[in-house]
């Protein structure tokens, strides 16, 4: 029911109609990848593209370049992608899901590694519209579902590789989320996951009071040992830490494409190692887990 409601709202959104008009032009487009997702059309639709893109703010993940329009997103998402890039050979000719895919930036980048099928899950109409704008020009076979991680067990298709980046700390039941990821895997499947974490050798998690780094819907920020225990309780047998990285103001910052505050406003102005609330400043751990 929720899926049908979101899909109906999406199809009735005025920007969806504008994107369909753009798509109907069937513009010739050169699609290329570097740090940005690059689209070169040399078209007469530049004004329309700019107007739609501005209406779709905030743009969180990216960047994207459409002709001479540079969508300078809040996150320099290629930094995270480059951390995972050495492991991208695992998606070649595989059925791949990106859970919490936002506007699809990571999926566009994954195309370079030739997945057999690529499906994004995110129950956000705005992010889906951002994806549709880019894909109206790029014309890729990526599929986007207005669904969440809880829909994986009943989705009807199992995946060889699942990416779940920056999601688990938004869930009030992280072990249930991990079980849902496990239920979405084929035999011998693998999950790549990242989360914010705290430095502590104990098997504990930070439970923020109201906000963490000014973000209201953060439930648990685990130690790496606690994260490992969550994964084991969910039924994963293999747990490997791939990398850790502190989030800095090069990776996440305010731009004209978000119209709101960003990391510099979320940290203690006197001590950048602390959030404005006094917690450890955000840092991320990247893991690979298998059944």
From Swiss-Prot:
Its EC number is 2.5.1.-. One of its GO terms (biological process) is tRNA wobble uridine modification. It catalyses: carboxy-S-adenosyl-L-methionine + 5-hydroxyuridine(34) in tRNA = 5-carboxymethoxyuridine(34) in tRNA + S-adenosyl-L-homocysteine + H(+). CDD domains: AdoMet_MTases. InterPro entries: CmoB, Mo5U34_MeTrfas-like, SAM-dependent_MTases_sf. Carboxy-S-adenosyl-L-methionine binds at residues 61, 75, 80, 100, 122-124, 149-150, 169, 284. Belongs to the class I-like SAM-binding methyltransferase superfamily. CmoB family. This is tRNA U34 carboxymethyltransferase. It comes from Campylobacter jejuni (strain RM1221).
